[in-house]
Amino acid sequence: MKDNNIENIVTLELVKEDELYKFKKDLQESFSVAVIEEFGSVDAGPIPSDEEIEKSFNAPGAVIYHILSNGIKVGGVVVSINEETQHNSLDFLFIAKGKGGKGIGYKTWKAIEEKYPETKVWETHTPFFEKRNIHFYVNKCGFKIVEYLSEKYNNPDEEGLPGG
């Protein structure tokens, strides 16, 4: 029997070039769970799209990490760091299916903040139907909601997100 009281030690490890394909697929699998729960299926292709992920991977200042809990890969994170302005972006954060609910997400966020202490502003986004994510970012991590986008109120510079 496993001891559920063992503390998770969360660390970040840079993703290697030859790991990007699997990282992308793991990210899409993780994100698809909420879409299927909300809408019943993922009809429009992988969520997020390959193009959206590649755009994030190739953005200026992009840094891609595996999330490790006690040395085992349990998820990943993509951040974009602007060394000049220190207005940085959390582009993707995911915990693999079955690995959540153990404080790993919050410990990951704290590890990111520790890694980038000069950051003045962090920005992120999540679909409106992702109530767990909204709770996590606002109530656990301290983000503030400054903009609400949906089909009715969207960002003309970006393609629509499912449910957003």
Q: What are these language model-derived features?
A:
Residues 10-25:
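A short beta-loop-alpha structural element at the N-terminal edge
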Residues 31-53:
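Conserved GNAT-fold acetyl-CoA-binding loop/helix
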Residues 48-66, 75:
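A short helix-loop-beta-strand connector motif used in the catalytic cores of GNAT acetyltransferases and
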Residues 64-66, 72-81, 89, 94:
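Conserved beta-strand in the GNAT
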Residues 93-100, 126-128:
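A short, internal acetyl-CoA/4′-phosphopantetheine-binding micro-motif in the GNAT/acyltransferase core
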Residues 95, 101-114, 139:
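Conserved acetyl-CoA-binding loop-helix of GNAT-fold acetyltransferases
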Residues 114-128:
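Conserved GNAT acetyl-CoA-binding A-motif
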Residues 125-127, 139-163:
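Conserved catalytic-core motifs of GNAT/GCN5-like acyltransferases
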